[in-house]
């Protein structure tokens, strides 16, 4: 058997660990070969590929961040228009099964391909942890660790200067990074996309802390956080070519409004892409490895149209159709639990 793999969408700590595990399992357990398509779906459309071998170079991938195959965003319309070319590329390279590793967009494309009779096994990847039907995705723990460490460091400087600090973290639709890093770092408030915020409530919480003699205030803000209607009007950034909203810096805009209303020194830190770069944590290396092994097993078992998934302590498989039906968002009850620590 000959397996094809690609990494799609944004990069993520643990991608190389998945690649390593697939290559090693296919070679050692099944005697199968693996071809990697470069730069995600673009490489599949353009037939740019490389042979992946179970050698010393493959072994060194475990702790390396990013993806050695490269990745890119490709518009779904371009994929649909290129269906014939995709099938031709797979046929020309003798690919029996394709393993796309990616987030919502990549897995949605994988599901579409499976409906077009392409043998596919999906591997979920996102630092946002918003893929449904899996308890967690690799990359999330690393991003959470980076965010928590950054907020830990901001506590001491905020306390020294009696400042209000707003920390913007990733999370377009789901606030898992913000919620967990806020709890782990002892932040005084967390704002997530699932729960619209009122700027006046933010200001009241800040004032209450300083009035009782506390020295500083840390608020974690997910990049996709939105105000309740009538609270504050954010600048509109329009949509990108994929139909995703362009963010215009919610933390900076909120910070300016808070500073104006309470006359306190407010500073904003945007963590940005540092959250998804660098060496994956031990948890992400292990999870990514287990996903890779299971994806290789599923491919050789003929279990196509599936996504590997973590449920409890076990790795299993779920239909791609179920996994891409909706995003996994933060439940209101989880936010309520965190809110007990606000202030």
Swiss-Prot record:
The active site is at 128 (proton acceptor). GO terms for molecular function: 6-phosphofructokinase activity; AMP binding; ATP binding; diphosphate-fructose-6-phosphate 1-phosphotransferase activity; fructose-6-phosphate binding; identical protein binding; metal ion binding; monosaccharide binding. It is found in: Cytoplasm. Mg(2+) binds at residue 104. ATP binds at residues 10, 103-106. Its EC number is 2.7.1.11. It catalyses: beta-D-fructose 6-phosphate + ATP = beta-D-fructose 1,6-bisphosphate + ADP + H(+). Keywords: ATP-binding, Cytoplasm, Glycolysis, Kinase, Magnesium, Metal-binding, Nucleotide-binding, Transferase. Pathway: Carbohydrate degradation; glycolysis; D-glyceraldehyde 3-phosphate and glycerone phosphate from D-glucose: step 3/4. The record marks 105 as: Important for substrate specificity. Its main location: cytoplasm. Catalyzes the phosphorylation of D-fructose 6-phosphate to fructose 1,6-bisphosphate by ATP, the first committing step of glycolysis. PANTHER family: ATP-DEPENDENT 6-PHOSPHOFRUCTOKINASE 3 (PTHR13697:SF52), PHOSPHOFRUCTOKINASE (PTHR13697). This is ATP-dependent 6-phosphofructokinase. It comes from Mycobacterium leprae (strain TN). The gene is pfkA.
């Amino acid at each position: 058997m000959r397996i094809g793999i690609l990494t799609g969408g944004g990069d993520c700590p643990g991608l190389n660990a998945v690649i390593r595990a697939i290559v090693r399992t296919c070679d050692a357990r099944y005697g199968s070969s693996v071809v990697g398509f470069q730069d995600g779906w673009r490489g599949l459309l353009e037939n740019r590929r490389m042979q992946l071998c179970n050698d010393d170079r493959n072994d060194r991938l475990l702790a390396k961040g990013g993806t050695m195959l490269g990745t890119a965003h490709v518009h779904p319309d371009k994929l649909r228009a290129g269906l014939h070319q995709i099938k031709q590329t797979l046929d020309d390279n003798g690919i029996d099964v394709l393993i796309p590793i990616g987030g919502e967009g990549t897995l949605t494309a994988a599901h579409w391909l499976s409906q077009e009779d392409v043998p596919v096994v999906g591997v979920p990847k996102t630092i946002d942890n918003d893929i449904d039907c899996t308890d967690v995705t690799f990359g999330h723990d690393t991003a959470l660790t980076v965010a928590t460490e950054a907020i830990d460091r901001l506590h001491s400087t905020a306390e020294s200067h009696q400042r209000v600090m707003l920390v913007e973290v990733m999370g377009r639709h789901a606030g898992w990074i913000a919620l967990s890093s806020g709890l782990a770092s002892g932040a005084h408030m967390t704002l997530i996309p699932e729960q619209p915020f009122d700027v006046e409530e933010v200001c009241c919480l800040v004032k209450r802390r300083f009035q009782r003699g506390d020295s500083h205030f840390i608020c974690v803000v997910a990049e996709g956080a939105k105000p309740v209607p009538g609270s504050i009007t954010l600048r509109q950034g329009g949509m990108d070519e994929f139909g995703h909203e362009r963010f215009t810096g919610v933390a900076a805009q909120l910070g300016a409004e808070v500073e104006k209303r309470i006359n306190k020194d407010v500073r904003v830190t945007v963590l940005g892409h540092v959250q998804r770069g660098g060496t994956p944590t031990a948890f992400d290396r292990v999870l990514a490895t287990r996903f890779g092994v299971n994806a290789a097993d599923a491919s050789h078992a003929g279990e196509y149209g599936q996504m590997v998934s973590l449920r409890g302590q076990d790795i299993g498989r779920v239909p791609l159709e179920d996994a891409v039906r909706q995003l996994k968002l933060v439940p209101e009850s989880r936010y309520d639990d965190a809110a007990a620590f606000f202030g």
